[in-house]
């Protein structure tokens, strides 16, 4: 199966950190294509970034069977919003993401900071969007001084990974974090492949035993 891992960086992330992470290295070693979402609108509305991410995911969906998105910090909010808008994301990983908001006023009065604020209208609006969403792995850094453990937990069912002895930035360079994320992503890929096989068997059963496999 063709599979791609999309990384969405945090606030004002330069993008050059992604190629250096063990997540990317492990993903490529395990046969995943990797893509960095080049977010040049980091200081603009999060909704604009989410819409741009939806467009990218739609394009990748034409050539890949499995799409997993990893969002670090603010990038996780953008990814969750894209999923809520119906982007064909199979799995979502958020790392140090302020799902419950945070008091970031010390970073200045930028509109994006207000959107990430505790109980903000933006966060409430995304949570209220109806529809199914992909499985989510929420990664929490034990020594994160920007996003608390409670703030990093999504408002919906999720798998939680708490990483000891690392902070908000260091967590994406932690090998054990990368290993767990890739194990989770590979298990998700296996589930998707099994569903495709079940669908193919059901389709062939309806058409007759000598019918060719269904094409997607």
Show which residues each predicted segment covers.
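Serine-dependent carboxylesterase/thioesterase catalytic core
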Residues: 3-9, 13-18, 22, 26-37, ...
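Charge-dense, low-complexity intrinsically disordered segments
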Residues: 43, 47, 113, 168, ...
